[in-house]
Amino acid sequence: MGVKLEVFRMSLYLTFPVVMFWISNQAEWFEDYVVQRKRELWPREKEGQRQELEEFKQKIRKQKEERLLQAAQQSS
């Protein structure tokens, strides 16, 4: 009984990773599960959203510059 159990366990240890690699490398599976899940988690950006972000970054940079200029003028 012990030898048969060890043979079964060893065959299970060897076949499980091989089967998992085979399944995960299937193109249809990858498209259905991985790419679709990625699109759900991180949807594509809208055009206006990127422009709003750039405007916000410029606004923050301008405020930082103004604070630095005020600090430089006060220290002089």
Swiss-Prot record:
Localization annotation: Membrane; Mitochondrion; Mitochondrion inner membrane
Q: What is its main location?
A: membrane
Q: Which GO terms describe its cellular component?
A: mitochondrial inner membrane
Q: Which processes are annotated in GO (biological process)?
A: mitochondrial cytochrome c oxidase assembly
User: Keyword Hydrolase: yes or no?
Assistant: no
Q: Where are the transmembrane segments?
A: 7-24
Q: Which InterPro entries match?
A: Pet100
Task performed by this protein: Plays a role in mitochondrial complex IV assembly.
Q: What protein family is recorded?
A: Belongs to the PET100 family.
Q: How does it assemble?
A: Interacts with COX7A2.
Please report the name of this protein according to its UniProt entry. Answer: Protein PET100 homolog, mitochondrial
